[in-house]
């Protein structure tokens, strides 16, 4: 059970990082 929760937590962190990077790149392109 602990491995499943940690796996989902890792996926959540990766998703947040990728989304933030994508938003940052789009903002730089707009500027």
UniProtKB/Swiss-Prot annotation:
Q: Where in the cell is it found?
A: Plastid, Chloroplast thylakoid membrane
The organism sits in which domain of life? Answer: Eukaryota
Residues passing through the membrane, by range: 4-24
- Name the UniProt key words of this record, in alphabetical order: Chloroplast, Electron transport, Membrane, Photosynthesis, Plastid, Thylakoid, Transmembrane, Transmembrane helix, Transport
Q: Which molecular-function annotations from GO does this UniProt entry contain?
A: electron transporter, transferring electrons within cytochrome b6/f complex of photosystem II activity
**GO cellular component terms, semicolon-separated:** chloroplast thylakoid membrane; cytochrome b6f complex
Q: How does it sit in the membrane?
A: Single-pass membrane protein
Signal peptide interval: none
Enumerate the Gene Ontology biological process terms.
photosynthesis
Q: Which HAMAP family does the UniProt entry name for this protein?
A: Cytb6_f_PetL (MF_00433)
Q: What is this protein's function per UniProt?
A: Component of the cytochrome b6-f complex, which mediates electron transfer between photosystem II (PSII) and photosystem I (PSI), cyclic electron flow around PSI, and state transitions. PetL is important for photoautotrophic growth as well as for electron transfer efficiency and stability of the cytochrome b6-f complex.
The protein here is known as Cytochrome b6-f complex subunit 6
- Please give the organism: Glycine max
């Amino acid at each position: 059970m602990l491995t499943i929760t940690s796996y989902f937590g890792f996926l959540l962190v990766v998703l947040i990082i990728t989304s933030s990077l994508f938003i940052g790149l789009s903002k730089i392109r707009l500027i």
